[in-house]
Amino acid sequence: MGTIFVDNLEPQSGTSLTLGASGDTVGLASGASQTLAINTPAFKARKTSDQAITHGATAKVLYETEDLDTDSAFASSKFTVPSGKDGEYFFSWSFDIINTSNQLEAWNTYLYKNGSSVFETVWNSGNGSNVFRRINHSYSCIQDAVASDYFEIYMYYESTGSTAGNLLQANKANFFTGFKLIGA
């Protein structure tokens, strides 16, 4: 095996550059990194305080803390696609909601894009006789996005007794994440 030392490797004009052949493994040396296949921008935000959701109303979910924000693109509880980062994005969100009166009956969550719903989840206990105290669910979807598109999470909530529900900050279960898909 030999070693080639170069600063730049370019194919001939109009051709492609191939490293290895079918079945070969191309590895990076210790301490080296690749910059081609990176899932950025990426973000993860979560709640750090409870948020009341009024019965029969749709509310924007407010995320107070960012655990990850590679491109400084998450602010005011929304993710905005940075310039030059067009493509397909994977989004996921989770919520933990409680109704202390044991009257949680229905909820919808929405992924909003540029102020309008583009993805909706629906859950309804049925006829009001099957109600819950606390529910935790997670959802995900893929959305096409271009620079300056922005994404937010909204929630609609109902209870049998018209009482408010609370999105809980405990256990970091209320979060919103997203990242650009490689090759999309």
Give the role of each language-model region.
Residues 110-146:
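Glycine-rich strand-loop-strand elements at beta-sheet edges
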Residues 87-97, 135-139, 149-157:
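Extracellular beta-strand-rich recognition modules
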Residues 105-107, 149:
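Short beta-strand/loop motifs in extracellular/secreted proteins, especially
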Residues 22, 28-103, 116-117, 121-128, ...:
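Terminal (often C-terminal
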Residues 2, 7, 15-17, 24, ...:
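The right-handed parallel beta-helix/beta-solenoid scaffold, focusing on the short coil/turn
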